[in-house]
UniProtKB/Swiss-Prot annotation:
Associated pathway: Pyrimidine metabolism; UMP biosynthesis via salvage pathway; UMP from uracil: step 1/1
Protein name from the UniProt record: Uracil phosphoribosyltransferase
Keyword Heme recorded: no
Pfam families: UPRTase
EC numbers, comma separated: 2.4.2.9
Amino acid sequence: MPTREIRHPLIRHKLGLMRRADISTKNFRELAQEVGALLTYEATQDLPLETYEIDGWCGKVQVEKIAGKKITVVPILRAGIGMLDGVLSLIPGAKVSAVGVARNEETLEAHTYLEKLAPDINQRLALIIDPMLATGGSMVATIDLLKKAGCKEIRAMVLVAAPEGIEVVEKAHPDVQIYTASIDQRLNEHGYIVPGLGDAGDKIFGTKQKDA
């Protein structure tokens, strides 16, 4: 499936604030949650609904709810945690399935070190969240893991994506829809997205940077 770049004015504005070199941990963290919530709105527009009856103030009324099992949100640790609250603000009943993936800084290859999945994940839509889609290694490893667990419908949301990473994921898993706030220019020689956001994990957790 082709990657969807969501160019909503609010997303563009907030993403511009996140790109500031002098942004504080507090502001980056809040903006990551806000953009995560806006992307969630876009990524869930086609969820199936079912009708049921309730007692309203003036009698019986037909209302709608999301059909079937609710979503499981899959943050890729550690940076994916920074988007989690924004997603859960719209889907508070979602299960959370955490996946830990680390990237070798020399080879840029990803390996999985943690998986805590919802026990019925094979019956749920899995929504992967990670601020950055750079080389695509972490995303592919996570999707591989979810499919091995029996997950049949998977979507991914990232704040910023590199064309190289998109190509890797789309080639490995053409059935997975990716939603992003921005498709950036390229990867640099160190595997970082340009212009990107810097190290999103460090900015979310306040490590290796001066807090403004």
